[in-house]
C-alpha cells in the first residue's frame, strides 16, 4: 500500500516507523534498486519523494505485508516528518509560451480604429481535479526460474510500464515480460499509474523473492485551463480583431507540456473571418498533482471557450448563436500551421438541422422568461449550442519526436500477426481484425489475425490516449496492410514477410488534421432550491469516419453521459438524448476520434447553457456545482 503526502511544498525529513516484523517490507526512495524516476516523453518525475514533497498526494513510501488488513493498519501508524521548505520556483523544465497570430503587421494591436469598435469579452475555466476509478485494480509481479520479471496489470501505455520497471530494477527491458489485463477506462486513469505501481511490486519481488501484489485505484488528473477572449466588432456587426489568452495548470510537472499547448491551439482557432488574430498559451507551475490530457478534456475545454464566446458575440449582436454561426462563418477554415483548410458547408448544414430539431432559436430567445427578474418558474433555464471539427492523435511534431511503430507479418501458415502494444479494452482489436480480414478476403478473422503483444522484441506502438487507435493508427494500419497484401501476392514471395509501420502519421502538412465534425445542443434547468444544473434534453448530430459504425449511437450516448458526470451536473428525471450520425468518407487522412468530438461538443454546449441560465457577464467555471452558481448569482466573479 502507498503512503501519500497530505501536504505540498514541504521538506521530507523522514518517517516515524512502528515496529514491523519480517512479514512487512518498506520501500522508500533510498532503497529503490535502480532509478527513482519515471520518464514520460522526456518529463522525469520521482517514483517516491526523497528530500522534498512537491504536491499533495505524492507517493512517499510503499508498504507490503502479509495481507491487506494488517498492511493497512500498519500503514496508519507510520508518521511523516516534514519541515518548512525554502522554496524557489524553477520553471526551467516548463515549455515556453506558445504564440500564434495573423494580420498584426497590417492592422496593429492598439490602433485608433480598434479603439472605436465594440468589445466583447468572455472567459471559461476548467478547474483542475482528479478523477478516481471506483474499483481498485490488481498489479502483480513475479520472477521465474530464469530471472525473467513478469508483470500483470491493465495499462493504457504498456511500453512505459516495461520501461519504468526496467529503470527501477536497473535492468534491460528484455528481462521484463508484461501480461496486460483488459480494462474499461473513462479517462486516462490507466495511463501513468500502472507504470509506477508495477515498479513497486517488481522491486518488492526482487527483494523478497516472492510474488507481490498491490491494489490501487486508477487516477486521472485533469489539468486546470483558463481562457480569456476579446473580440472587436465594427459598426456593421462584423468581427474584425480577436485576442485569446490561455493559462494551463498542469501541476508541479508539465507532462508533455508542449503537446498540451498544441492540442489547445488547434481548437481555439476561430471559424469566422478576422483581419487579425492573436493567441498566447502559457503553462504555469503549481503544487498540484501532475496532469496530462484526462480523457480529451483539453479538447473539450478549448471548444467550450469558443462556444461561450460565440454565445457572447451573438447576444451582443442580437442574434442567436446558430444565426451567428451561419451568418459569420467562412466557407472554410483558414489554413494554418496547426490544421489545413477545411470546408465548413456540411458543418453549417448540421447546425441548421439541429437548430430546427431542437427548436433552438425560439428557446434561446425566450430564455429570459425563466431567468432574472422575469423568472416566474422555480428554476433558471438555459440552452447552449456547439459545433466543431474533430482532431485526434498526437501532433506531427510529437509523432516525429517519438517514432512509435507497429509490425505486421504474413506467416507461412497464411496468418497475419500484429505485433506491438495495443489497448486491452473490451473491444480493442475489433477494428484491427476487420481491416485485416477485409484486405486479405478472409471470412474467418479469428483464424487469420493473431496478436503478439508485450513481447521482448515488440515495437513500441505508443500510448492509448487521444483515441489514437481509432484515428491515425488505423489509417496507418490500412496502408501497411495493403502493402503487405501486395508483397504476399507476388509469385516469388518468400514467407514469412514482415513489415514495420508508423503508428502515427508523420506526413501531415500541418500539426493536426481534421476528421469528422458535429453539433450538439444541451438544454438545462437550474432549480432555485438546489442550484445544481440538471440536463433536460440533449441533441447530438455528428459526421464521423470509422472503419465500422456498429453500435456507434450507444457509444456516443455513453461518452456524453460520462462527460456530464465529470462536469458536476445531474440528469433530470425526464432526461432525453437524441443521437444522429452519418458516415464521412471524403478522402480523410485519419479516422475520427469519437471520444474527442462528442466530449468536446457536449461540454461546450453545456457550458453555454449554464452561462445563459445564470446570466453571467463573461463565462463559467467547470466542473459546476451549487457553490459556483451561488457565487455567480451573488455577483461575485
Q: Language-model segments: which ranges?
A:
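Cofactor-binding beta-sheet edge motifs in enzyme active sites
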Residues: 1-349, 353-358, 362-637
Amino acid at each position: 500500500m502507498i503512503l501519500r503526502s497530505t501536504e505540498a511544498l514541504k521538506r521530507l525529513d523522514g518517517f516515524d516507523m512502528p515496529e514491523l516484523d519480517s512479514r512487512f517490507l518498506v520501500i522508500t526512495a533510498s532503497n529503490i534498486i535502480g532509478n527513482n524516476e519515471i520518464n514520460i516523453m522526456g518529463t522525469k518525475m520521482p517514483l517516491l519523494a526523497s528530500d522534498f514533497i512537491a504536491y499533495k498526494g505524492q507517493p512517499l513510501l510503499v508498504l507490503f505485508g502479509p495481507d491487506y488488513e494488517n498492511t493497512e493498519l500498519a500503514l496508519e501508524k507510520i508518521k511523516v516528518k516534514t519541515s518548512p521548505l525554502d522554496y524557489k520556483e524553477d520553471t526551467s523544465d516548463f515549455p515556453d509560451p506558445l504564440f500564434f497570430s495573423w494580420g498584426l503587421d497590417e492592422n496593429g494591436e492598439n490602433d485608433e480604429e480598434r479603439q472605436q469598435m465594440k468589445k466583447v469579452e468572455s472567459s471559461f475555466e476548467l478547474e483542475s481535479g482528479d478523477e478516481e476509478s471506483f474499483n481498485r485494480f490488481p498489479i502483480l509481479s513475479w520472477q521465474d526460474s530464469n530471472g525473467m520479471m513478469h508483470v500483470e496489470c491493465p495499462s493504457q501505455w504498456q511500453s512505459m510500464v516495461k520501461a519504468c520497471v526496467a529503470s527501477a530494477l536497473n535492468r534491460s527491458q528484455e528481462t521484463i515480460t508484461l501480461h496486460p489485463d483488459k480494462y474499461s477506462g473513462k479517462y486516462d486513469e490507466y495511463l501513468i499509474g500502472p507504470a509506477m505501481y508495477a515498479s513497486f511490486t517488481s522491486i518488492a519481488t526482487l527483494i523478497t523473492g516472492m510474488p507481490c501484489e498491490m491494489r490501487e485505484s486508477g487516477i486521472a488528473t485533469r489539468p486546470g485551463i483558463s481562457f480569456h477572449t476579446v473580440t472587436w466588432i465594427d459598426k456593421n456587426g462584423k468581427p474584425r480583431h480577436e485576442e485569446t489568452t490561455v493559462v494551463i495548470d498542469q501541476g508541479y510537472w508539465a507532462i508533455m507540456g508542449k503537446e498540451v499547448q498544441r492540442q489547445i491551439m488547434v481548437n481555439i482557432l476561430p471559424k469566422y473571418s478576422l483581419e487579425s488574430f492573436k493567441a498566447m498559451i502559457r503553462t504555469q507551475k503549481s503544487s498540484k498533482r501532475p496532469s496530462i490530457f484526462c480523457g480529451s478534456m483539453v479538447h473539450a475545454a478549448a471548444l467550450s471557450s469558443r462556444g461561450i464566446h460565440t454565445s457572447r458575440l451573438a447576444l451582443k449582436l442580437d442574434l442567436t448563436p446558430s444565426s451567428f454561426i451561419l451568418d459569420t462563418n467562412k466557407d472554410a477554415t483558414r489554413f494554418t500551421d496547426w490544421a489545413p483548410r477545411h470546408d465548413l458547408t456540411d458543418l453549417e448544414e448540421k447546425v441548421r438541422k439541429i437548430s430546427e430539431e431542437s427548436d433552438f432559436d425560439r428557446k434561446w430567445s425566450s430564455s429570459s422568461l425563466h431567468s432574472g427578474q422575469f423568472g416566474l418558474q422555480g428554476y433558471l433555464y438555459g440552452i447552449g449550442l456547439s459545433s466543431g471539427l474533430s482532431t485526434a492523435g498526437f501532433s506531427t511534431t510529437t509523432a516525429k519526436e517519438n517514432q512509435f511503430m507497429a509490425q505486421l507479418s504474413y506467416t507461412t501458415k497464411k496468418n497475419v500477426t500484429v505485433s506491438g502494444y495495443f489497448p486491452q479494452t473490451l473491444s480493442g482489436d475489433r477494428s484491427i481484425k476487420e481491416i485485416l480480414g477485409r484486405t486479405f478476403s478472409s471470412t474467418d478473422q479469428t483464424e487469420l489475425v493473431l496478436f503478439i503483444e508485450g513481447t521482448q522484441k515488440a515495437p513500441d506502438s505508443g500510448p492509448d490516449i487521444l483515441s489514437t487507435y481509432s484515428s491515425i493508427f488505423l489509417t496507418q494500419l490500412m496502408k501497411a496492410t495493403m502493402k503487405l497484401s501486395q508483397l504476399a501476392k507476388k509469385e516469388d514471395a518468400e514467407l514469412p514477410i514482415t513489415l514495420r509501420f508508423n503508428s502515427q502519421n508523420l506526413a501531415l502538412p500541418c500539426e493536426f488534421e481534421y476528421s469528422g465534425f458535429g453539433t450538439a445542443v444541451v438544454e438545462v434547468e437550474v432549480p432555485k432550491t438546489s442550484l445544481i444544473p440538471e440536463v433536460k434534453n440533449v441533441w447530438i448530430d455528428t459526421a464521423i469516419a470509422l472503419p465500422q459504425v456498429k453500435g456507434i449511437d450507444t457509444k456516443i450516448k455513453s461518452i456524453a453521459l460520462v462527460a456530464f458526470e465529470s462536469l458536476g451536473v445531474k440528469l433530470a428525471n425526464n432526461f432525453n438524448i437524441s443521437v444522429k450520425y452519418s458516415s464521412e468518407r471524403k478522402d480523410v487522412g485519419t479516422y475520427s476520434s469519437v471520444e474527442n468530438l462528442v466530449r468536446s461538443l457536449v461540454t461546450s454546449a453545456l457550458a453555454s447553457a449554464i452561462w445563459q441560465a445564470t446570466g453571467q457577464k463573461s463565462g463559467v467555471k467547470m466542473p459546476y456545482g451549487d457553490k459556483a452558481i451561488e457565487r455567480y448569482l451573488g455577483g461575485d466573479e
